[in-house]
Regions:
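Non-catalytic, conserved peripheral segments adjacent to functional cores
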Residues: 1-94, 108-133
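Glycine-centered loop/turn positions within well-structured domains
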Residues: 103
C-alpha cells in the first residue's frame, strides 16, 4: 500500500444553531492518533493563494477547514500518485495526511479560508521538505 492510499477523509458532525456552530476536528479516537502531544495551529489562505507546498518524512498531519473552502492537493513522494480533495467547510471533514505525502492547500474561492491543523511532532525544519506542485 502506498502512502497516499493511507490518506483518510474522516466525516465530522457539524452542530449549528442560532448561536453559531461547533465542530470536533480531532476527537482522540482517530486510528493514527499519537499518544503524545504535537502541535495545533491555524492558517488562513487568501483567495487565489496556496499554503504549504511541502512534505514531511516523519510527521503526520490532520487538516480541517473551519471557514471557507479549499482544495487539498496531494502527491505521494514514493509512487508519485496524485489526489485532490475538495474541502468546503460545509462538508465537515478532517483529512489525515501520512508522512511522505506532499501537500498544498489552494484557495479556489473568492473568500479567505481558515485551516485548523494538528501534527504529531513539534516543528522541525529538517522534517519539512519543499515540494513544487
Amino acid at each position: 500500500m502506498s502512502q497516499i492510499d493511507k490518506v483518510r477523509i474522516i466525516p465530522r458532525r457539524l452542530i449549528a444553531d442560532d448561536r453559531g456552530w461547533f465542530l470536533k476536528a480531532i476527537t482522540g479516537t482517530e486510528e493514527d492518533i499519537p499518544s503524545h502531544t504535537g502541535e495545533v495551529y491555524l492558517t488562513m489562505g487568501k483567495p487565489g493563494q496556496a499554503k504549504g507546498g511541502h512534505y514531511h518524512p516523519e510527521a503526520v498531519e490532520w487538516f480541517t477547514i473551519i471557514e471557507g473552502s479549499a482544495i487539498l492537493k496531494l502527491e505521494d513522494m514514493e509512487t508519485h500518485e496524485h489526489r485532490d480533495i475538495e474541502m468546503p467547510f460545509e462538508k465537515a471533514q478532517t483529512v489525515f495526511i501520512p508522512n511522505g505525502v506532499a501537500h498544498i492547500v489552494v484557495n479556489n474561492s473568492d473568500k479567505d479560508f481558515i485551516l485548523l491543523a494538528y501534527t504529531d511532532k513539534l516543528y522541525d525544519p529538517a522534517d519539512t521538505i519543499k515540494f513544487d506542485f
